[in-house]
């Protein structure tokens, strides 16, 4: 029987995702493959007292995991796609992108049913500049406060009354079966998600032809098209997942998609949104074209200001 090792972070959500892929592999190749998990701490897991946007560097949640792939101590890695940098280390590639979970965000609150129901000056917790910008574009009166930690930690702080509301990825809440007394899904087009949000990426070495064949069943072409378009947009902006950039692609036919991209300033006062359509064969290039449009329409100036303010490090 063939044995595979999945490298993963140790958070509840990361472990759920790795266990999910483990189960799919062992079911598809029943009696032929068994899978174990190798838990690895990343820089992003260790540095918890600094907002993510200020930690700096690429691959905050993947670098140490990729090192395990390169040194052979793990066969494959399961990542949240929104954490995966645009450029992968030489010798590694994203072999599979499974079917995507809902990419939206969710507002959670103990007392208030929706974003519109929050009182003036309400304290809203999020570690994401993308969420901050879009929240302030809709509600300039809100007091946005940095909130780091795993899903459980953030929910506990909400339940303990430290915040009137918090915003988290819908996919993580659904995967872990978590909720709060009140919640509102903040979905496109009103509120755009991070590039790749809700999708998983299976990374392994390019020279592992055995894994290409064995794991091909995991790849979901519509999800790959959407994610490649979104990642093209982010690459064209030379941005990371900690910058006020959002991208969301949807399939409009068997091989056709539409992508909407957004760049905003930190206060949500200037928001640039543009849309393009494309086909699977040119997904990444259409994302790059959308980035060029957005940059020409003022996003370059906005991003320069964000980096100059020190709110985020240029990737």
Swiss-Prot record:
Q: How is the cofactor bound?
A: Binds 1 dipyrromethane group covalently.
> Per the record, GO CC terms?
cytoplasm
Residue numbers carrying S-(dipyrrolylmethanemethyl)cysteine: 241
Family annotation (Pfam families): Porphobil_deam, Porphobil_deamC
The record's InterPro entries line, in alphabetical order, gives: HemC (IPR000860), Porphobilin_deaminase_cofac_BS (IPR022419), Porphobilin_deaminase_N (IPR022417), Porphobilinogen_deaminase_C (IPR022418), Porphobilinogen_deaminase_C_sf (IPR036803)
Instruction: Write out the GO biological process terms.
Output: protoporphyrinogen IX biosynthetic process
Catalytic EC class: transferase
Question: A GO molecular-function term, please?
Answer: hydroxymethylbilane synthase activity
Q: Which cofactor does it need?
A: dipyrromethane
Superkingdom assignment: Bacteria
The Enzyme Commission number assigned here is 2.5.1.61
- The SS bond pairs are none
Query: Which pathway does this chain act in?
Result: Porphyrin-containing compound metabolism; protoporphyrin-IX biosynthesis; coproporphyrinogen-III from 5-aminolevulinate: step 2/4
Which key words are in the record? Porphyrin biosynthesis, Transferase
Question: What chemistry does it catalyse, as a reaction equation?
Answer: 4 porphobilinogen + H2O = hydroxymethylbilane + 4 NH4(+)
Q: Which NCBIfam families match?
A: hemC
Subunit and interaction comment: Monomer.
Explain the purpose of this protein: Tetrapolymerization of the monopyrrole PBG into the hydroxymethylbilane pre-uroporphyrinogen in several discrete steps.
Report further notes. Answer: The porphobilinogen subunits are added to the dipyrromethane group.
Family membership, please give it: Belongs to the HMBS family.
What is this protein called in UniProt? Answer: Porphobilinogen deaminase
Q: What's the source species for this entry?
A: Nitratidesulfovibrio vulgaris (strain ATCC 29579 / DSM 644 / CCUG 34227 / NCIMB 8303 / VKM B-1760 / Hildenborough) (Desulfovibrio vulgaris)
As recorded in Swiss-Prot or TrEMBL, the protein's gene is named hemC
């Amino acid at each position: 029987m063939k044995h595979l090792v999945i490298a993963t972070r140790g958070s509840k959500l990361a472990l759920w995702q790795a266990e999910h892929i483990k189960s799919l592999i062992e079911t598809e190749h029943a009696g032929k493959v068994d899978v174990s998990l190798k838990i690895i701490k990343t820089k992003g897991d260790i540095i918890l007292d600094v907002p993510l946007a200020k930690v700096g560097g690429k691959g905050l949640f993947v670098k140490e995991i990729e090192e395990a792939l390169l040194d052979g101590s793990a066969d494959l890695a399961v990542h949240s796609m929104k954490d995966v940098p645009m450029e992968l280390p030489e010798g590694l590639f994203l072999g599979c992108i499974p079917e995507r979970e809902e990419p939206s965000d969710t507002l959670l609150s103990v007392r208030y049913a929706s974003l519109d129901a929050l009182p003036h000056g309400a304290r809203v917790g999020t570690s994401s500049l993308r969420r901050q910008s879009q929240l302030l574009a809709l509600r300039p009166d809100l007091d946005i406060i940095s909130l780091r930690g795993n899903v459980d930690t953030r929910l506990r702080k909400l339940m303990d009354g430290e915040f009137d509301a918090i915003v988290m990825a819908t996919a993580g809440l659904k995967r872990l079966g978590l909720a709060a007394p009140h919640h509102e899904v903040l979905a496109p087009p009103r509120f755009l998600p991070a590039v790749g949000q809700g999708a998983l990426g299976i990374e392994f070495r390019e020279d592992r032809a055995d894994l290409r064949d064995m794991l091909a069943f995991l790849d979901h072409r519509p999800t790959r098209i959407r994610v490649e378009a979104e990642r093209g947009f982010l690459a064209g902006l030379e941005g990371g997942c900690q910058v006020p950039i959002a991208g969301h692609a949807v399939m409009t036919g068997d091989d056709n998609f539409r992508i909407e991209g957004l760049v905003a300033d930190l206060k949500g006062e200037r928001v640039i949104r543009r849309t393009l359509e494309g086909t699977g064969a040119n997904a990444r290039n259409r994302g790059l074209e959308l980035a060029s449009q957005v940059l020409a329409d003022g996003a370059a100036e906005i991003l320069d200001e964000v980096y100059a303010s020190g709110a985020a490090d240029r990737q």
